[in-house]
Amino acid sequence: MATANDVVLRAITMDNFAECLHLAVREDQKGFVASNMYSLAEAKADGVSIPCAIYADRDLVGFIMYDIAANVGRGYVTRLMVDARFQGRGYGRAAMGLVIERMKAKAACREIYTSYVPENEVAGHLYRSLGFEPTGEVDHGETVMRLVLYDGSFAP
């Protein structure tokens, strides 16, 4: 299984843009996550999302997108996909770990939210295993999860 040391996040540039657009989940997973083309267009339009290519060694294996709303102390992981050829190797977990660490480094980020299509049991298991808990909310048919980084209390 991959670890955060095996995986790096890189900016989407003209050098990897086309390859990123060609990443795809399995056919039975297509309803679980927006296409990378849509996600990149959304990032360009909203001006706050941070899209990243997930690399393992020299291979582009997936895509993750997040943003940090410092004014409300929240981070959001809005997309995570690993190409069908590279699934089951721990790359999604490693990429999530890297994004969580980036958000922890932002003092204003106290909690992280994400969501998943309920039928995507693998995503639900992944997020729970990383410490995310269901909020009880449903957003556009997706189960909302939250990871508390800092609850405002101080340890003695």
Where are these regions (language model features)?
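Terminal substrate-recognition subdomain of acyl/acetyltransferases
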Residues: 2, 143-156
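Conserved active-site alpha-helix within GNAT-family acetyltransferase domains
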Residues: 93, 118-136
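Acetyl-CoA-dependent GNAT
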Residues: 6-78, 83-85, 96, 102, ...
